[in-house]
Amino acid sequence: MSVQNICSTKAYDMLISNDNAFLVDVRTREEWQQVGIPHLDNKNKMLFLSWQLNKDFEDNFLSIINDKIHAIIFFLCRSGYRSFIAANFITNIGYKNCYNISDGFEGNNQDKGWKQNNLPWQF
């Protein structure tokens, strides 16, 4: 199964309505601090694992979400590129319900993104 692209508004709806859904934000620590992060009422549904230059990404991911092989996992970055790569990587190790939030946190050339779509976020 391949990674599916999904817009931020649909991903948010699925995240808040499904107890088995998780958000993995793969941006850098600097991006989280300077631009903001998504806000979900259930903090246990959010993982912050920087993808860039992180040789421990797989180990860190598995240490947190190892027992949730059937979970629905949404990957988020600034504009949808890094998150797509991370989602593919995790799909290749056995997780089949991976989605790339294609418009990202800040948007891309075609779409607004999490923040500009007025979805909950915070610093």
UniProtKB/Swiss-Prot annotation:
PROSITE patterns: RHODANESE_3 (PS50206). Residues 17-117 form the Rhodanese domain. InterPro entries: Rhodanese-like_dom, Rhodanese-like_dom_sf, STR4-like. CDD domains: RHOD_1. Gene3D superfamilies: Rhodanese-like domain (3.40.250.10). This is Uncharacterized protein RP600 homolog.
